[in-house]
Amino acid sequence: MHLMYTLDNEGKRVYTLKKMTEEGEITKSAHPARFSPDDKYSRQRVTLKKRYNLLPQ
C-alpha cells in the first residue's frame, strides 16, 4: 500500500491510500522517483524544468 495524493480546489495536496478518488479521478504517487547515479536523462529533465520555470526558487 503506497501513499497517494490528489489536489483539492485550492491546489493543496490531499493524501490518501486509495488509487482513485470518489469522483473517479486517478490519484498520484506521493513518493519521489528512485535515484540512480547512472541516470542518462537528468540533464534533459533539468533543462526542461528551467525552460518552464518548474525548479524551486
UniProtKB/Swiss-Prot annotation:
Gene Ontology terms, MF aspect: snoRNA binding; telomerase RNA binding
Entry keyword set: Nucleus, Ribonucleoprotein, Ribosome biogenesis, rRNA processing
Subcellular locations according to the entry: Nucleus, Nucleolus
SUPFAM superfamilies: Nop10-like SnoRNP
Residues spanning the signal sequence: none
Region (Disordered): 22-42
GO BP terms in the entry: positive regulation of telomerase RNA localization to Cajal body; rRNA pseudouridine synthesis; snRNA pseudouridine synthesis
Main location: nucleus
UniProt cross-references to InterPro entries, sorted A to Z: H/ACA_rnp_Nop10, H/ACA_rnp_Nop10_sf
GO CC entries: box H/ACA snoRNP complex
Family: Belongs to the NOP10 family.
Function noted in UniProt: Non-catalytic component of the H/ACA small nucleolar ribonucleoprotein (H/ACA snoRNP), which catalyzes pseudouridylation of rRNA and is required for ribosome biogenesis. This involves the isomerization of uridine such that the ribose is subsequently attached to C5, instead of the normal N1. Pseudouridine ('psi') residues may serve to stabilize the conformation of rRNAs. The H/ACA snoRNP complex also mediates pseudouridylation of other types of RNAs. The H/ACA snoRNP complex mediates pseudouridylation at position 93 in U2 snRNA.
Subunit structure of this chain's protein: Component of the small nucleolar ribonucleoprotein particles containing H/ACA-type snoRNAs (H/ACA snoRNPs).
Protein name per the record: H/ACA ribonucleoprotein complex subunit NOP10
Organism: Candida glabrata (strain ATCC 2001 / BCRC 20586 / JCM 3761 / NBRC 0622 / NRRL Y-65 / CBS 138)
